[in-house]
Every structure is written in C-alpha cells, then in structure tokens.
C-alpha cells in the first residue's frame, strides 16, 4: 500500500499548485494499512485539521482510483519527537556575539508597531497567523521551529515581530532577538575578523526566542550556514523557540544545506499567500485609522483592486494620498487617487471588459466562451462560469443585470448568487482561491 500512497501523492502533485502540495500533501507520510484502511500520518494537529477539512476527499478519490472504492483513509498525528539534535563538540562551535541581544538593558531589534493587534488576518494568512499566535502563547511548545514562507510584502516580518512583542508584553525579562539573515551574517563576519567568536556564541545561544527574517539569504554561504546550524542545535536542545521566514518552501531554497532544510521541517511550516481584495481593503482601513487618514470606500476599493499584492506597496499608496490631502487641504476622492497614483495604478475598470474576462477564463479552463454563457449545469462548467462572473463584478463597472445579459441573458439574481458563492468559497477552498488569484493577476498584467 505504500506504493499506492506514493503514486497518489504523485497524482495530486499534478493537479495542485506547487505551494499547496508542498504545504499540505507532501508532509503526509505512509504509516501502514489494515484490511481496506490506509493509515497516514500528519506531522502535527494543524496539518491534520486542515487536510481533513479541505483535502481529504481529494486524497481519498486519488487513492481509490488506484485501489477500489472500498478503501478508506485514517489520518493520524505524528508522535512528538523524543530525539534531540546532537550537541556539537566544542571544536565545532564557532558562533559569536558582540553585544547581548535582549533583556531590559539591550535592544531586541523588534518593531513595536508590528503586533498581532495591528495585523489584519484574512483567508490568505489565517494559518500563519494562528501558528504565530500559538508560538507566542507557548514558546518552544508544539511548533518548534516555526517556518513561515511567502512572497515579498505579505506580512512575514510583521508576524515575526508580533511574536516577539507579545512574549515581551508577558515577560519583560525574556531574551528575544530579531535579526535578518543578512545582519546575522555580517555580525558573524565581524566577529571572525576581530576574533570574538565566543561573544557571538553567547549572544545567540542564550536567547529564549530567536527570530530570523529572510533565511534564504544564507543559502550558498557555507560558513554562515555552519554557524546557524550549530546555533539552531544549541537552542533546540535547550528548548528555546526558533522562528524563521523565507520567500520559499525549505526544499525550494537553492544552495540551502540538507541538514538545515531537514531541521526546518522538524516543526511547523506555514505559508502566507497573496491577500484577496477584501483583505486588502481591511489592511487599508486599519492603516488609515492608525494614521488618521479619511479614506472613502470607493478609494479603498480602487487601491485594493490594484494588481499589487505587496502590503507595503499598498500602504505606500495610502500614505502618498494622505500626504497630498494634508498638503493641499483637499479631501481624498477617487479622482484624486486616480491622478496621484496614475504612475502606479492602471485603472483596470477602464480597460478590462466582460468579454475579455470571458475569453481569458474560457482559455484557462480549456472551454469555449459559449460554454460560459450556456445554461448547462455540468460541474466542469458551473465553477468556471461562477468564477468568470465573480471576476466581471470585481474587475469591471458592469452592474449585475449587465453581466447577466452578457452571460446568455441570465437573471441578475443568478449573477448575485454566483458572486456570493465564489466569495464564500474563497475563504474555504485554497485551490479555488489560487485559481482566482492567478486569473486576476493574468488579467491585470
């Protein structure tokens, strides 16, 4: 049955996105079988719950296609590891430390503005947010290390700081260190140069929580990886929390040593995906309130509907509008936003049409536009049709009746139902959300 599971994984890899497969399916291991039950093992409760909720029917279908319809699946949780990393010999330890990193008399390098209260949680980052909160509430508990990955400007750095700030709010004496991997490497180089490796070791290995941002930058740097490896081992053995972020899944970081890659996979791996329009609006609202900027609803939607998924860029647009409003004494309006941000945002509502969306979606699903306009209720047509209708409402100024007219004369209530159906699925179905995001980006590019 192990061969069946490996083949089922291979089949699932062909239909799921690379990121989804790596996050949810690849970590599932074969345990054994009894009668017609396939026993599988999830690395932790988080993964088990999410797979059971979103992917178990798909997994079961894949397995049954290779066996028979009577095969069942039992998804268990891996037992906690009792093995700990081997303590490196004194001759191997070459870590260094110039100044202490935390405690009442030293800087943690944390940004006090980045807290869980200021983090906007949506479907795209809910898992990573929950994982970060769990670590902050119980450091070195179930999820050690915690590895958070995702694209630029999606909130990884915010969550790292939020973990540190929360722990400090509970325990001011906690020794916490937030470093970028580049700063870690530069400090290592300086300590090697001035022969202060003992200080380097004492600094990082006495931490209660080590937070490293953008770990991918140490890939290919042999000495830095070696020092981080020993630091990781020392902290892990001392039951201290380690949290790192990256723009890629551990296995996808070129030049990263296998021993580090395997250690990152000991704990929990959580991804952050691009925010949807609703989450971007919520982010803008929170930022506007914090900066005392009066932001009309139509302007918030205009900014959120831009092609950028980078939260920092999104907030930068808001700050720019706020500055213009403050300096000119004028209220922010949609016309002002279009004028001030014309070099950044192309107003998609002026360029994208219902016909363009229909053609683009039909090509993506290998369908004909006529299929999307038809009344056929085949599942292979219903979902693409609903997605196309949702995108028409999202990316054009067309009203519900106008969209219905272009989809074969459908009633506006049918169009409203399709939009609401997709909106609901976006928060529940990772694959559908990825598909919608891919289509949206393609239409805006």
From Swiss-Prot:
Residues 326-445 are annotated as: Domain IV, binds dsDNA. Oligomerizes as a right-handed, spiral filament on DNA at oriC. GO terms for biological process: DNA replication; DNA replication initiation; regulation of DNA replication. Residues 1-71 are annotated as: Domain I, interacts with DnaA modulators. Residues 83-106 are annotated as: Disordered. The keyword Ribosomal protein does not apply. GO terms for cellular component: cytoplasm; plasma membrane. Belongs to the DnaA family. Plays an essential role in the initiation and regulation of chromosomal replication. ATP-DnaA binds to the origin of replication (oriC) to initiate formation of the DNA replication initiation complex once per cell cycle. Binds the DnaA box (a 9 base pair repeat at the origin) and separates the double-stranded (ds)DNA. Forms a right-handed helical filament on oriC DNA; dsDNA binds to the exterior of the filament while single-stranded (ss)DNA is stabiized in the filament's interior. Its main location: cytoplasm. One of its GO terms (molecular function) is ATP hydrolysis activity. Pfam families: Bac_DnaA, Bac_DnaA_C, DnaA_N. This is Chromosomal replication initiator protein DnaA. The lineage of its organism: Bacteria, Pseudomonadati, Thermodesulfobacteriota, Desulfuromonadia, Geobacterales. It comes from Geobacter sulfurreducens (strain ATCC 51573 / DSM 12127 / PCA). Residues 71-108 are annotated as: Domain II. Keywords: ATP-binding, Cytoplasm, DNA replication, DNA-binding, Lipid-binding, Nucleotide-binding.
């Amino acid at each position: 049955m192990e061969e069946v599971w490996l083949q089922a994984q291979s089949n699932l890899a062909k239909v799921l996105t690379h990121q989804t497969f790596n996050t949810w399916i690849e970590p599932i291991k074969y345990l054994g079988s009894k009668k017609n039950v396939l026993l599988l093992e999830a690395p932790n409760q988080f993964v088990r719950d999410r797979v059971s909720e979103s992917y178990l029917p798909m997994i079961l279908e894949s397995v049954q296609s290779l066996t028979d319809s009577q095969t069942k699946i039992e998804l268990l949780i891996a037992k906690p590891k009792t093995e700990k990393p081997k303590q490196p010999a004194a001759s191997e330890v070459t870590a260094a430390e110039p100044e202490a990193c935390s405690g009442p008399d030293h800087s943690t390098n944390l940004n006090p503005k980045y807290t869980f209260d200021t983090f906007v949680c949506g479907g795209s980052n809910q898992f990573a947010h929950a994982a970060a909160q769990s670590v902050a509430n119980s450091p070195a508990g179930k999820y050690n290390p915690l590895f958070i990955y995702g694209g630029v400007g999606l909130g990884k750095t915010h969550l790292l700081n939020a973990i540190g700030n929360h722990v400090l709010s509970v325990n001011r004496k906690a020794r916490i260190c937030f470093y970028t991997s580049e700063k870690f490497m530069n400090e290592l180089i300086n300590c090697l140069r001035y022969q202060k490796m003992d200080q380097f070791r004492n600094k990082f290995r006495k931490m209660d929580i080590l937070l490293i941002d953008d770990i991918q930058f140490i890939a290919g740097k042999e000495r830095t990886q070696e020092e981080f490896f020993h630091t990781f081992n020392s902290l892990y053995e001392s039951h201290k929390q380690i949290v790192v972020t990256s723009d890629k899944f551990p296995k996808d970081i070129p030049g990263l040593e296998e021993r580090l890659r395997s250690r990152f996979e000991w704990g929990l791996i959580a991804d952050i995906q691009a925010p949807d329009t609703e989450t971007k609006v919520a982010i803008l609202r929170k930022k506007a309130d914090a900066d005392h900027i009066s932001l009309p609803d139509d302007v918030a939607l205009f900014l959120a509907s831009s092609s950028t998924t980078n939260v920092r860029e999104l907030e930068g647009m808001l700050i720019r509008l706020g500055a213009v409003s403050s300096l000119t004494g004028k209220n922010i309006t949609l016309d002002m936003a279009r004028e001030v941000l014309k070099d950044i945002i192309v107003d998609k509502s002026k360029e994208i049409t219902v016909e363009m969306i229909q053609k683009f979606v039909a090509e993506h699903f290998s369908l004909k536009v006529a299929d999307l306009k038809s009344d056929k209720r085949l599942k292979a047509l219903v979902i693409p049709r609903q997605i196309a209708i949702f995108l028409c409402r999202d990316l054009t100024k067309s009203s519900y009746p106008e969209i219905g007219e272009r989809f074969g004369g459908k009633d506006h209530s049918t169009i409203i139902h399709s939009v609401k159906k997709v909106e609901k699925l976006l928060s529940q179905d990772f694959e559908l959300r990825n598909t919608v995001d891919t289509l949206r980006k393609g239409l805006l590019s």
